[in-house]
Amino acid sequence: MLIHPNFDPIAIHLGPLAVRWYGLMYLVAFIAAIVVGRLRLRLPYVAAQGWTVKDIDDMLFYGVLGTILGGRLGYVLFYKASFYFAHPLDIFKVWEGGMSFHGGFLGVTLAMVLFAYQRKRSWLQVTDFVAPMVPTGLAAGRLGNFINGELWGRVTDPSSPWAMLFPGAAPDDAAWLTAHPQLAAQWHLNEVFAQYHMLPRHPSELYEIALEGVALFFVLIFFSRKPKPMGAISAVFLIGYGLARFTVEFAREPDDFLGLLAMGLSMGQWLSLPMILVGIGLLVWSYRRARHEPAQAVSVN
């Protein structure tokens, strides 16, 4: 079994100031997006759209605002609405944690709509350009989660080579043993708990880095290396992220204040299903439009 390194959440101490790893990952995500965006400017069809370095900088400014505002509001509405409605001032305590990818996605989408309107560009042309820049940021965010030892996975067989002990999960592990006696006996988890006072879990943050970050990045980079019908790159992102998140959620521990919802699915899975369906619909629409209106549909217009 592996043991979580239990990193110090503070990455850098600057006198009275403390820079946390998770905050540092936002900076890493921002820089990575700039690098990927500038590399994409070298593609002939992207250059033909008239994108500039200033466009990337301005777009990321909108994107950061959309991510923070949407991510926070999404967490408030999707995950802990009753608590925040009772304590509305706590909504502004972002330093205490609580961000939602799906909320951040909606926030970024609205931000890109505004950016497209101001630049008089097609909204889908903007999202097609942005989509390959996103996975590196997702990977950085999940790395921040792993360093913090949070958002760990579900309990698993200790014989699994990837099973990991998370100290932060220890307070919940005794209750898990009581609630799942048969599985505990099958996996000999009582013995493990007696020795470590913790239970082995999936390092689901690392799974998300691999699928939502690395794999999705290469899929989008490969798919977008040549011109595609407008909306197709955005569609592949929606489908790819939705499938990756839906899959990883089977190994990720559900939020304790929500648990599993209808059909035994988590909130993350229910929020990912619409992304997959919309992505499939958008992909079909974009290729049909390209076939019937080739002069208007290709992403280089």
Curated annotation (Swiss-Prot):
Q: What residues does a 1,2-diacyl-sn-glycero-3-phospho-(1'-sn-glycerol) bind to?
A: R142
Q: Name one GO molecular function term.
A: phosphatidylglycerol-prolipoprotein diacylglyceryl transferase activity
Q: What class of enzyme is it?
A: transferase
The organism's superkingdom is given as Bacteria
Enzyme Commission no? 2.5.1.145
Question: What is an example of a Pfam family matching this protein?
Answer: LGT
Q: Which residues cross the membrane?
A: 17-37, 59-79, 97-117, 230-250, 265-285
Topology in the lipid bilayer is annotated as:
Multi-pass membrane protein
Pathway where it operates:
Protein modification; lipoprotein biosynthesis (diacylglyceryl transfer)
Main subcellular location: membrane
Keywords, ordered alphabetically: Cell inner membrane, Cell membrane, Membrane, Transferase, Transmembrane, Transmembrane helix
- Could you provide one GO biological process annotation from this protein's UniProt record? lipoprotein biosynthetic process
One GO CC annotation, please? plasma membrane
Against InterPro entries, the record matches this protein to: Lgt
What is the annotated localization of this protein?
Cell inner membrane
> What HAMAP family does this protein map onto?
Lgt (MF_01147)
What the protein does comes down to: Catalyzes the transfer of the diacylglyceryl group from phosphatidylglycerol to the sulfhydryl group of the N-terminal cysteine of a prolipoprotein, the first step in the formation of mature lipoproteins.
Stated family: Belongs to the Lgt family.
- This chain's protein is named Phosphatidylglycerol--prolipoprotein diacylglyceryl transferase
Q: Which gene encodes it?
A: lgt
